[in-house]
Amino acid sequence: MPESLTPIKSTGSPAHRPHLVLCFTALLFAFSTVAVHAQDVHHPPDYTSIVVFGDSLSDTGNVADLSEAKYGVRIPGPYADYTDGRFTDGADTEPAAENYFGVWVEQLAATLPAKPEIKASLDGGTDYAYGFAFTGDGTSVFSFGTSDELSVVVNNIGQQIADYLATHPKITDKTLFVVWGGANDLLNATSEDDIIDAGINQTLNIQRLVDSGATQFIIPNLPPLGLVPRLNGSPTTSVPATKAAELYNQVLAGGIAVVRDFNRDRHLKLAQLDVFALFNQIIAAPSSYSLVNVTDSSQGMAVDPDTYLFWDSLHPTTRGHDILATTAAEIIAQRECREHSDAAGLTDPHADCAGEVAVETSGAKH
């Protein structure tokens, strides 16, 4: 979000809980009560739907719907130099994107055989993400300025999941779940405990979905936050932000490992998208991605945004989203390759099947 869209407070940010990391297993044991039938792991599903929980990186219109209902103007939208409903560029922004459209989950859906529709939940779709969502329960106040005079109340990720489960009691293995958040928690954190809380919250969000029958996941971690335009100008802001992202990612990775181990009889597919490593790779070698600028925002500038990584001070361009989508699609393809290799009894699977966390973007447009 640009500096004019400044978050001011959250009514649902996590409370301090002592000894959180040591309580992972106990929490998950108390949290898990629902039996799930194992699926045939030899035949990966053709995803017919994608359900998204997250923040502004995945929002496709929920915040814009709220602002339109309250103020008669869609923000994000052309009024604030964003493509309609999304915190990124598009054909209706200045400058305009020419080659890409939509946030990463929309672009990911377009690569899948069934091409599942991505639409904001307030419009009847399955994208429950809201800009400025935190990882916890409840709601947050998202301000469009420096005070709460122009603001909307958004659902945090825990609340997003609760809303989804309230109307979707049955989950099939043809549904891919995306759970991505944490940046707003970190940008508003006042202590290391706040960062750890965010990772714990996200772990419990994932386990709650598993308890309800979800088995197919894409779970991105956070990029090095100190490298975004808002924070990359000085070591005093960039270094702590990146260290916070590293800590959050460590807690999340540990939590995912616990979820995987605790539910090993359920054949979960918890694919982790290593955005931290991916962004470091992009910024180290931008020309490999046909990018010319990976440090500044392109919003309102006389530049080609398709050659920039960032649109505003925090969010990627649609080209940046394209790289994320391509990487996520490769993770899915690698997973299918490994499972088909296992089913065929191959002892030396194809090299493309190696590893679960993809960082390369060989399928991206160069």
Region annotations inferred by a language model:
Residues P7, H16, A26, H340, ...:
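General secretory precursor processing signal
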Residues H19-L22, A343:
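Intrinsic structural disorder/low-complexity segments
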